[in-house]
Amino acid sequence: MQDILTVILAGGMGSRLSPLTDDRAKPAVPFGGKYRIIDFTLTNCLHSGLRKILVLTQYKSHSLQKHLRDGWSIFNPELGEYITSVPPQMRKGGKWYEGTADAIYHNLWLLERSEAKYVMVLSGDHIYRMDYAPMLEEHIANNAALTVACMDVNCKEAKAFGVMGIDERHRVHSFVEKPQNPPHLPNDPERSLVSMGIYIFSMEVLQQALIEDADDDASSHDFGKDIIPKLIDTGSVFAYKFCGSKGRVDKDCYWRDVGTIDSFYQANMDLLEPIPPMNLYQKDWGIRTYEPQYPPARTVSSGSGNEGIFINSIIANGVINSGGSVQHSIVSSNVRINDSATVVDSIIFDDVEIGEGCQLVNCIIDKHVKVPPYTQIGLNRLEDAQRFKISENGIVVVPESYQF
């Protein structure tokens, strides 16, 4: 698809995901034992034929930029293909991006240089699989100014999203960002139609909208709050329903905003379901990433004769379980689990050592942590709260490189 430029917004602070985002951008947070969050959006682009991609970075972007370099330097510039990381250029003044629309406005020169007819705007911090090609086809067929991908959710959940109203032709006639009382679907009072933060603009429409928005001192320079509501009046904004039968990706209807510790934890745990709600195993839709070349995971008997055990868990390469027990957990690469240690309902990031006799329950252990022998985490909320962050649902988070 040579006529479309893809812009991935990857510069948000992700403060609700702290401490996992204390030293990295949210799209660079590890997920599922081997991936980074942004890998899902980039994989969708790859399989959808989108080969001109700008990744707009900002907040603590080193880890993200390194991942893009190591894992995604796969396109051929001689064929006009690229994935380019774009930090703030300060071309329109020495300030950080003030909103999603402002981020693209400050890089309009790159859009103009691309000579594309259409611009796809994506977020780098959602977990889902989607073929974007049919959405572009509908955008062109409708002669739309803007096409917004959408899905229906429970009305209570809709408060966190932009809520849309559409007619029988899927033309959008209303859009309100994060309403306290979300309007429901006409045929279902318990469900609302929400934006997924996936947009296709016709280039000239986007350019004009961003220029006008930049001149509006009252604007928050956000797509959901400012750009989309104004474009609706043109009558050329259409909705594209996610989870249809179009495209090459299997219909699993899974999309998650992993902006909080609890939503991030649950999205990981979803992968451990007997039939996961998101299919990572579709042969022609593999999730690409960068992964160090570690040897295969293994179990080994400990000195006391205990066998290493994995039950209903995802285990990455380089893991050695020497007499420990791992149940319903995700263990990333190069992790060492020692004798009589137990890990239950937990997420372990790379390069962690879990000492003899440790008990870890309902926790997330970030990278480069050495958990001392017989440490308990997730069993005593009062003790855990003195050392670590605990989410609303009781998930204990041990930050990167924490020293016990």
UniProtKB/Swiss-Prot annotation:
GO terms for biological process: glycogen biosynthetic process. Keywords: ATP-binding, Carbohydrate metabolism, Glycogen biosynthesis, Glycogen metabolism, Nucleotide-binding, Nucleotidyltransferase, Transferase. Alpha-D-glucose 1-phosphate binds at residues 97, 162, 177-178, 195. Gene3D superfamilies: Hexapeptide repeat proteins, Spore Coat Polysaccharide Biosynthesis Protein SpsA, Chain A. Its EC number is 2.7.7.27. Pfam families: Hexapep_GlmU, NTP_transferase. Pathway: Glycan biosynthesis; glycogen biosynthesis. One of its GO terms (molecular function) is ATP binding. It catalyses: alpha-D-glucose 1-phosphate + ATP + H(+) = ADP-alpha-D-glucose + diphosphate. InterPro entries: ADP-Glc_PPase, ADP_Glu_pyroP_CS, GlgC_bac, GlmU/GlgC-like_hexapep, NTP_transferase_dom, Nucleotide-diphossugar_trans, Trimer_LpxA-like_sf. CDD domains: ADP_Glucose_PP, LbH_G1P_AT_C. Involved in the biosynthesis of ADP-glucose, a building block required for the elongation reactions to produce glycogen. Catalyzes the reaction between ATP and alpha-D-glucose 1-phosphate (G1P) to produce pyrophosphate and ADP-Glc. Belongs to the bacterial/plant glucose-1-phosphate adenylyltransferase family. PANTHER family: GLUCOSE-1-PHOSPHATE ADENYLYLTRANSFERASE (PTHR43523:SF2), GLUCOSE-1-PHOSPHATE ADENYLYLTRANSFERASE-RELATED (PTHR43523). Homotetramer. This is Glucose-1-phosphate adenylyltransferase 2. The lineage of its organism: Bacteria, Pseudomonadati, Pseudomonadota, Gammaproteobacteria, Vibrionales.
